[in-house]
Structure formats: C-alpha cells, structure tokens
Amino acid sequence: MMENFKHTTVLLDEAVNGLNIRPDGIYIDGTFGRGGHSRLILSQLGEEGRLLAIDRDPQAIAVAQAISDPRFSIIHGPFSALADYVAERELTGKIDGILLDLGVSSPQLDDAERGFSFMRDGPLDMRMDPTRGQSAAEWLQTAEEADIAWVLKTFGEERFAKRIARAIVERNREQPMTRTKELAEVVAAATPVKDKFKHPATRTFQAVRIWVNSELEEIEQALKSSLSVLAPGGRLSIISFHSLEDRIVKRFMREQSRGPQVPAGLPMTEAQLKKLGGRELRALGKLMPGEKEVAENPRARSSVLRIAERTNA
C-alpha cells in the first residue's frame, strides 16, 4: 500500500503561467509527480485541450491513473523519450508547451523505503523507477574506486571525493552496504572537515542519485527533443533545483536563442546562411520563489524557473 506523502508543488502558478496556456492547446507535463502542475494545467484547458503527462516513478503513475479526465493521459517512462511518445500519437511539431520540474520530489525524499534520504534509514536504492536498472547499493558494490570518486566529484562537487570513495570501497569489501544509514555513516566518518550547515553525506547522496538515474543525460535529451516536438510559439517551462541542472537548462536556452555561430570574416552566401537556420528559441527569462513561498516550503529555496518560446525558424 502506498503511503500518502505530502508534496507541495514549487513555483506552481509561475511555471504554468510560463506555458501561456491556450484552452485548445496540447501540453506535456514531463514530471507528473503528485500532479500539482497537471491539475492546474487541466483547470485552464477547454474541452478541446489535451495534456500528456509523463513519469518514471510507479507511485506517481498510480496517482495519475486516478485522474478520470478524457483530456488527460499518463505515460510510465522517462521524459527523455518525450519525442517518441509524441511521435507515436502523431503530434510532432504540435505541442504548445512542455513543463519539467527536475530532480527528486518530496514524496521520494520522505519515503524511507525509496532510499533517497540520509535522514531516514531505508534500503539503499535511489532509483526513480525501482523496476528498472541498478540500485545505488548494487552500483556502489560493483563500481571501481576511481569511478565512484569521479561521480562524487562531477555530480556532487564533493571536495573529499577520493577519500569518501576509498571508504565506500573498503566498507563494501568488509560488509556490503544495503542501507542509507550505513552509507551516511561511512561518508561522515571519511569527511575530515564538517560543514555545520550541511550534513556531510548531502553531496554524496546527490551525486549517487544523479548517476543511478542518469538525470543530467535525461535533461539534455529532453531539451534536444523539445525542439522537434514544440509548435512555433510553444513554450518550455523548466524548474531546476541545483546548479548542475540549471547550468544545462541555461546553456541550452542561451545557445538556441543565439542561433548558429559563424566565425567573423567567413565567406558565406545568403543561401548557405539560410541553410544554417535561425534561432530555435527565444529565452523569456527566469523566476525564483518569493520569501513567502520559501517560508512555507523551505525546499523551494534553491529552485529556479526558466522559460523559453519556440521560434518560427
């Protein structure tokens, strides 16, 4: 039985407003979660509107399946494959907006059995979809020390990555870790300098989670796919929660807003320039949560919403 863990949707109104909803439009919520954004989108759609929601978490799928609305459909899978889902429905180039709320959700963090949190002891899993792929425990038991260190440094920006990786490998040789508490204790013991404002396992848990779920690759693929999926004037509305996610989104929107970069002085005909194409997106700026939202939901503090619009190029 699935427990009802509370989830407060971050930047709810702002993210949906960023889609510039048309009553008869077709929209994608690529991260259904507990349905906060989807329900608000549906409330703004008319009878002809459609909403396609995606999530790879079986618990989110169970929540979505309880929505009995003919305008709504749910897909169990990664949002990186959104171009395939759209093509299967013959909607390529017809999508009016895509919303992505990146990272781990509050219900996933709060449910000890999911293994995302160092604050609650549970199985060392961390998979967004527990039915697919390697768990965190399985990966840490089989990975090379150098690979673990690279993951901690790259995806957790952990300055003690090598020390922690060595401690993880040594501990797994003695007794394989299967619990979140075990990993948190190993990391804490291997960290020589503690940050009084942050648990020593914070960066390690973030890095392992990102690696196990291929989160950054998922984001990059979804962003690339959005260009073929969106109709001219269609919107991208994306919420990020840490610098690694936001960096990818920011870079993508900036590059697609600039168009092809041709070196100065390179001789090109008008036909060649036209073939290169123009700007794919128009960046519409970013928003951050206000003081009131952060006070009511501290997890919103690090969130950033970026919005862009598909051009006619």
UniProtKB/Swiss-Prot annotation:
SUPFAM superfamilies: Putative methyltransferase TM0872, insert domain (SSF81799), S-adenosyl-L-methionine-dependent methyltransferases (SSF53335). GO terms for biological process: rRNA base methylation. InterPro entries: RsmH, SAM-dep_MeTrfase_MraW_recog, SAM-dependent_MTases_sf. Its EC number is 2.1.1.199. S-adenosyl-L-methionine binds at residues 35-37, 55, 79, 101, 108. PANTHER family: 12S RRNA N4-METHYLCYTIDINE METHYLTRANSFERASE (PTHR11265:SF0), S-ADENOSYL-METHYLTRANSFERASE MRAW (PTHR11265). NCBIfam families: 16S rRNA (cytosine(1402)-N(4))-methyltransferase RsmH (TIGR00006). Specifically methylates the N4 position of cytidine in position 1402 (C1402) of 16S rRNA. This is Ribosomal RNA small subunit methyltransferase H. The gene is rsmH.
